[in-house]
Regions:
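Expand to "…catalyze enediolate/carbanion chemistry for C-C bond making/breaking, isomerization
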Residues: 1-235
Length: 235
């Protein structure tokens, strides 16, 4: 259930000696606006070490195909504003060209990024499904159910999964308002009951669309999923 370790480009140098000789799968992450040279330097620092780079996460830019590390599976953070639709369409084009590229939306607030409410997240999910692309979500998914935590609102992992399933099911007649209602649901019993109806095929199609989520402490959502008897208990 836990994928590669997400490492900021600025922190690769600190991780190398800690890894020792034990292979560690990592994804190098850089915030939008980080110079490509800094990302390249971080990747260069992993050469000959135990760090196995599985991909890079950067802000979307029109020339991402020409970046020196574009051969690494890239995850492109989608901006707000005028470039949003262009960026999502570009990810679709990249996937159709054979690139292992995905979109990313930041679901948690930062000093420079206002928290995306359920309507904004619903629009992202709708557009991703309509374009037929894969996405990951990062930041803010510390709990399985929508709620107020640490002084502010946070989206829930189960809410997101159920919303993605609904978007796929209703792909011929997309209803962003309905997805927003799902994303605002705060009753874990309602969400858990919905997920329990999924068979393997339905689960796989959700996972093909929502490939991953980034979280500071993965034990929180996993523990909460176990408490709802949706996964085996985590040690």
């Amino acid at each position: 259930m836990v994928g590669p370790l997400l490492v900021p480009a600025s922190g690769v140098g600190e991780l190398v000696p800690l890894a020792g000789g034990t292979p560690v799968g990592v994804v190098v992450v850089a915030r939008p606006g980080t110079p490509a040279a800094d990302v390249s330097a971080a990747l260069d620092a992993t050469h000959g070490t135990a760090l196995d780079v599985r991909g890079v996460e950067i802000g979307w830019q029109a020339d991402w195909r020409s970046l020196p590390f574009a051969d690494r599976p890239p995850v492109l953070e989608i901006p707000r504003g005028a470039d949003r639709d262009r960026a999502l369409a570009d990810v679709r084009d990249g996937q159709q060209e054979g690139h292992a590229v995905q979109a990313k939306l930041r679901t948690g607030a930062t000093p420079t990024w206002e928290w995306p409410d359920e309507h904004e997240l619903a629009r992202h999910i709708t557009d991703v499904v309509q374009l037929g692309i894969s996405t990951k979500l990062t930041g803010g998914l510390h709990h399985v159910v929508r709620g107020d935590h640490d002084g502010g609102p946070q989206h829930g992992l189960l809410d997101v999964l159920v919303a993605v399933d609904a978007a796929i099911t209703d792909a011929l007649a997309p209803d962003t308002d309905r997805l927003a209602e799902i994303l605002a649901e705060r009753d874990p019993a309602v969400l858990a009951a919905a997920v329990r109806t999924w068979d393997a095929d339905r689960t796989d199609r959700v996972r093909r669309t929502l490939t991953a989520y980034g979280c500071c402490g993965v034990t929180d959502p996993i523990t909460e999923l176990a408490e709802l008897d949706l996964v085996a208990g985590a040690a």
